[in-house]
Each structure stands twice: as structure tokens, then as C-alpha cells.
């Protein structure tokens, strides 16, 4: 078994906005949430015997036990966290899953492992918030229809600050922390000039982002505005080599439009899945080669890019905590061993970064 480990990324003062909220409002903010991606419930390895439904569900439930087992666990007491004295991990406001929920359309098994009513723990029920991935079928698939039902249930329970007209994109507002779930990627339509390499699906296909960028722009304009409140964005495709290879899961033009839309907002983090790897990195990479920059943006590279903290999610657990104006991100690998405080990042965000002006 892989030794449990924490990868800690600490961003001190990352959430200090241009317009500073009242001190009492910041003092009251204490938000914890968990993020995983790519559980691929129902996956069958063609080189191994077929797994039964019981095996699939059993493995998934053990994964949930490892994730929820971090609740009540002390944060690392050494390194840069020592001065913050964060205490123990609280019950999260939500468990977010950044796509590729299933393989083989096993929505039945997925909802047994991650019930629509929430994951039950000894400390309470945890709502589950979903994004779709490229393995989750076309818009009329059982998984997509199931995700829509879960989103509408969150809406009826008044957990959401906003939801798109089609019910597939949404946002929550946790004490002034805005978390947006944007599906496959924050774009509006399939890029017809550079379509997905295999199958070349068009509008209405499984790779259609379904107006996610327009939903994001509208939400940020109407619910965040010039407040400087922190924003977290989640979608399936990222900025890693797999997400930006010549299959064109999403395209340089789409990424540049996304980048431009974030100007003026206090983006605390971007979360994604797809590459099955837990990591923290900056986008755009300030040390990127000209070739890498072209891969990200084509011929439309921003001249003096603002960078964003990006967290790639595997199938175990990023733990995020926002207290006042501090943002802590740590990766938990399961029960049993200790803490790994590498890599450690300590940085502040300047007003220029927050404005995003070039």
C-alpha cells in the first residue's frame, strides 16, 4: 500500500482582496472542502478478470472511507503550518468531484458509493458536488441525466448561489468564497476550427462545454463584481500535458478566452482532473518555453500574463481550508503514515495580480 502522505501548499494572504471586507466578516469565514477527481466507478481492466458490481462498490466505499478518515485528523504541526496553528480537519462543506465519475455508464454503482443525499460520516452528511468528464457520456447518457438530477436537488435544497439554465453548471457561495463548477472546461462551444482529434464531435456531443464560459462570466459579473471576494473554479480539463496535447480536448483559443475572462477577479485556485495526478502548479507557467506557451495559447499569448494557482486532483483527496484571508491546500493520501510538507509554497497576491490588467 502506498504510504499516506500530505502535500501541503500554503498560500498566505492569497485571499486579500482589492476591496477588503469588514474585519468581522473575515473573522467569521472558516470554510473546509474536499476535492477529488476521476474515480472512474465501473472501470474494468481488460487484462484482468471482470470485476463484479460488489467488488466495484466495495472498492469505492473503501475510497470514501479513506477520504472521510481525514476528518478530525490534525494538520501538520511543523513547517510553515506551525505558525498558523490550524488544528484539526473539520467536516467539509462539500466533497467536490472534478469529472470522470464513471466508466461504462455505471451511475447505479456511483450513486451507491456517493449517494445523491450526501456521504454520511460520524460527524454528519457531506454534500457531493459534481462536474462531468469525458468518460461520462453524451448529454442524454444515464450519467449526465443523473448529474443533472443531483444539481437540481442541490438547487431545491438552496445550496447553490446560481445554476445555469440547463442545470449543468453552478456555483456555491460559502461565506463569501465563491466556488464554480464548470463541467468539461470553461468554454461555450466546441471549437470548430480545431475539433477533438478523434471522432470530431460537434455541438451537443459529449465534448460540448455547453456555455460554461458564459455562465462563469455572468456569475462573476453579477455575484462577485468588484468586491474582491475569492473565487475557486473547477472543471475537468486542465493545463497539463495530457489536457493540452494534440487531441485538443480543449483548444488554445478556448484557454485564451478563459484567461481573459478572469481579469479583475480574485481567483484563489483553479481545480481540475483528467490527468489522474495530484499536483500544484502555476498557469500560465512563468518559466514556460516558447513552445509550451504556444501550446497553451497558440498565437494569442498574453504579453505579461498573470499566473493562477492550479491544483490537479487525483482520486484521493485535496483538503482546502479558507480562514479569514488565508488559504491552505493540503493533499491527503489515506490512512496510516505521517505528513509530507513538501512542496511548500508561501506567497502573497499583489493588487496588480488581482486586477489582472496587462
Regions found by a protein language model. Name each.
Residues 105-218, 257-263, 269, 280-333, ...:
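Extended active-site neighborhood of metal-dependent phosphoesterases/phosphodiesterases
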Residues 1-7:
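Bacterial N-terminal signal peptides that target proteins for export
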Residues 35-37, 93-100, 128-134, 233-236, ...:
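Active-site neighborhood of phospho(di)ester-bond hydrolases with catalytic His/Asp-centered motifs
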Residues 27-28, 81-92, 122-125, 225-229, ...:
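Short helix-terminating capping/connector loops at secondary-structure junctions
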Residues 22-108:
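N-terminal active-site segment of His-dependent metallophosphoesterases
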Residues 24-58, 73, 127-129, 161-253, ...:
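Metal-dependent phosphoester/phosphodiester hydrolase catalytic core
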Residues 7-17:
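Bacterial N-terminal signal peptides
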Residues 355-358:
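Short, solvent-exposed mixed-charge patches
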Amino acid at each position: 500500500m502506498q504510504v499516506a502522505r500530505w502535500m501541503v501548499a500554503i498560500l498566505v494572504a492569497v485571499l486579500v482582496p482589492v476591496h477588503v471586507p469588514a474585519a468581522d466578516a473575515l473573522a467569521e469565514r472558516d470554510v473546509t472542502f474536499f476535492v477529488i477527481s476521476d474515480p472512474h466507478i465501473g472501470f474494468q481492466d481488460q487484462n484482468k478478470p471482470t470485476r463484479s458490481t460488489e467488488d466495484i462498490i466495495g472498492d469505492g466505499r473503501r475510497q470514501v472511507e479513506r477520504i472521510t478518515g481525514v476528518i478530525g485528523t490534525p494538520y501538520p504541526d511543523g513547517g510553515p503550518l506551525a505558525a498558523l496553528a490550524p488544528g484539526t480537519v473539520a467536516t467539509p462543506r462539500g466533497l467536490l468531484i472534478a469529472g470522470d465519475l464513471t466508466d461504462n455508464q455505471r451511475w447505479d454503482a456511483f450513486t451507491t458509493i456517493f449517494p445523491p443525499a450526501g456521504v454520511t460520516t460520524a460527524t454528519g452528511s457531506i454534500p457531493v458536488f459534481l462536474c462531468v468528464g469525458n468518460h461520462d457520456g453524451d448529454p442524454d447518457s444515464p450519467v449526465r441525466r443523473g448529474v443533472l438530477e443531483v444539481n437540481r436537488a442541490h438547487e431545491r435544497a438552496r445550496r447553490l448561489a446560481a445554476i445555469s439554465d440547463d442545470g449543468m453548471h453552478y456555483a456555491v457561495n460559502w461565506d463569501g468564497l465563491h466556488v464554480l463548477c464548470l463541467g468539461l472546461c470553461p468554454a461555450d462551444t466546441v471549437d470548430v476550427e480545431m475539433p477533438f482529434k478523434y471522432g470530431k464531435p460537434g455541438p451537443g456531443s459529449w465534448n460540448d462545454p455547453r456555455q460554461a464560459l458564459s455562465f462563469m462570466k455572468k456569475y462573476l459579473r453579477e455575484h462577485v463584481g468588484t468586491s474582491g471576494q475569492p473565487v475557486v473554479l473547477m472543471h475537468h480539463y486542465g493545463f497539463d500535458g495530457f489536457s493540452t496535447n494534440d487531441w485538443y480536448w480543449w483548444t488554445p483559443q478556448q484557454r485564451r478566452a478563459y484567461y481573459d475572462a478572469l481579469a479583475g477577479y480574485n481567483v484563489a485556485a483553479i481545480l481540475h482532473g483528467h490527468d489522474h495526478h495530484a499536483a500544484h502548479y502555476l498557469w500560465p507557467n512563468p518559466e514556460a518555453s516558447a513552445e509550451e506557451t504556444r501550446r497553451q495559447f497558440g498565437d494569442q499569448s498574453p504579453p505579461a500574463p498573470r499566473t493562477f494557482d492550479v491544483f490537479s486532483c487525483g482520486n484521493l483527496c485535496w483538503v482546502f481550508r479558507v480562514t479569514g484571508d488565508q488559504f491552505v491546500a493540503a493533499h491527503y493520501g489515506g490512512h496510516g503514515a505521517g505528513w509530507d510538507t513538501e512542496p511548500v509554497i508561501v506567497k502573497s497576491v499583489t493588487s496588480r495580480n488581482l486586477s489582472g490588467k496587462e
